[in-house]
Curated annotation (Swiss-Prot):
Any one GO cellular component localisation term in the record: cytosol
Residues annotated as binding NAD(+): 32-36, 81-82, 113, 136, 173, 290, 314
Gene this protein is translated from: ligA
Job description of the protein: DNA ligase that catalyzes the formation of phosphodiester linkages between 5'-phosphoryl and 3'-hydroxyl groups in double-stranded DNA using NAD as a coenzyme and as the energy source for the reaction. It is essential for DNA replication and repair of damaged DNA.
Name recorded for this polypeptide: DNA ligase
Active site (record annotation): 115 (n6-amp-lysine intermediate)
Amino acid sequence: MEPIEQQLTELRTTLRHHEYLYHVMDAPEIPDAEYDRLMRELRELEAQRPDLITPDSPTQRVGAAPLTAFNQIRHEVPMLSLDNVFDEESFLAFNKRVQDRLKSTENVIWCCELKLDGLAVSILYENGVLVSAATRGDGTTGEDITSNVRTIRAIPLKLHGDNIPARLEVRGEVFLPQAGFEKINEDARRTGGKVFANPRNAAAGSLRQLDPRITAKRPLTFFCYGVGILEGGELPDTHLGRLLQFKAWGLPVSDRVTLCDSPQAVLDFYRNVEKDRPTLGFDIDGVVIKVNSLALQEQLGFVARAPRWAVAFKFPAQEQMTFVRDVEFQVGRTGAITPVARLEPVQVAGVLVSNATLHNADEIERLGLRIGDKVVIRRAGDVIPQVVNVVLSERPEETRPIVFPTHCPVCGSDVERVEGEAVTRCTGGLICGAQRKESLKHFVSRRAMDVDGMGDKIIDQLVEREYVHTPADLFRLTAGKLTGLDRMGPKSAQNVVNALEKAKATTFARFLYALGIREVGEATAAGLAAYFGTLEALQTATIDELQKVPDVGIVVATHVFNFFAEESNRDVIGQLLAEGVHWPAPVVINVQEIDSPFAGKTVVLTGSLSQMSRDDAKARLAALGAKVAGSVSKKTDLVIAGEAAGSKLAKAQELGITVIDEAEMIRLLGA
């Protein structure tokens, strides 16, 4: 066997292995970027020796064989995948190939849309009624997922409107919004269930459940982007026209679809989407560029596994492979001990990553991680980089186990793990320098007491020099004492003292949030402040009384009750008040006297708003007598859903709670 034959055989075997893990097991071992690199290498070798191309080469087909647990559906029209480009030069070369094949000097009109990172599906409607749905599978045969697809609320069971074809097969992507993904993993960590590496895996795992009742509980959604079978009817002769027709029939279509009349316009679209990517609320890994004219598409035709008239222009990879060099343990403000992987530095999504969170001991056990392992690292948007999985097939011989500490790495106190919790905590409290530092950083943060100019490095020095032990000590600092800190001149020191003085005037809600009570975020703090009105009333509340507050269940109520029951906490609060911390007396809102549809209602906001900030919306709702909560429960009266609403919207629909959109909220605010 020639060396190139051996190389081709090994590459094909490796790619088939990873295709099986990705398409069939929903458990990819390597990042997409590494798969793409291997595929490019195979294509280049086959281009050198086309006589060695085999019919079963990964370059000649679409995906992997379907699971036998599902019935199989044969695609009457094959579901092909797209070829990829990864930079401007490659896209421009693709554009030139299309122009040359069309023998045209005029610019092609391109239809550009998002490349969703989910699971491709085919849905068949007969006389407007959904009759079957299937995964892509190997492009020829997929898995019958009809029962599961019927549980996805975004997918209509019956199309509406005029001129619906007798048989219409639409194609699109089932995906999971990021908020829903985070909620699923949060629940899984709490209950010991399966934690998914990323939203794509979670969507695939949710859609390919043998029990549709499980799928129904997952907040999956869907965007339509193409057509397979078309019988007994007509569709527009442009791709954009078809998308608009699908939307008119009730099928969801992404609103980020644009016609581009030049290669430069396509590049501008690509850059704009890349810039907006962190705020979309769902994962994409590029943009899809298609010739808009169906006549030109037909003229261009197909290669073995992809159309010549479309390409996926992919973003820089959000996942890369590297090695874990060590694991260190950090202590947070509530004593939570978090393992952090120290990595061989690697570029991920344009950022050099050298650390990644490992969450807790359970996550380390789930990953099967050892120091020295080769791992896949993921960084999406502003999310802290995390280890997605271990590349077990490439584990070095010299790895060693990760040993979780039995004593706090900072203060030496015992650590404990409460039954039912995933987090291990230091028991040292404020004698622990790390907890003290993090508690004080939280106290002065922008959304808490908002002490301008008091950054993390100042807090670190204040604690290390024993100048500050509790939040009250901050208000006793003088410019003279601050001047002794590193890089702190007299003027800067006086500015910090002035900022501390200004911060004394706050709100009850901010003060509660600044105290750092476990599980009490901004929304819960605002709810407690609004419900009880005064510190005295809150301090003396029972656990049962605390649970009457929207968003407060038994766990949060217990944390709040225990916090105020602790004498040292009450002492610190007394000192803060003695130093002059104050807030306005509560304004009692009589909801009976407010003529507003929001008066007396418990309201939850979810998704992103385009007409006003979330804080403005909360303030206006509260002024009209609404109680704005942070999570959906049986106590919730109304959910306001913005763009890319996730798990909160799904839960509201599950509980039968009224849901309105942003436009309706604005209309009612002005009513």
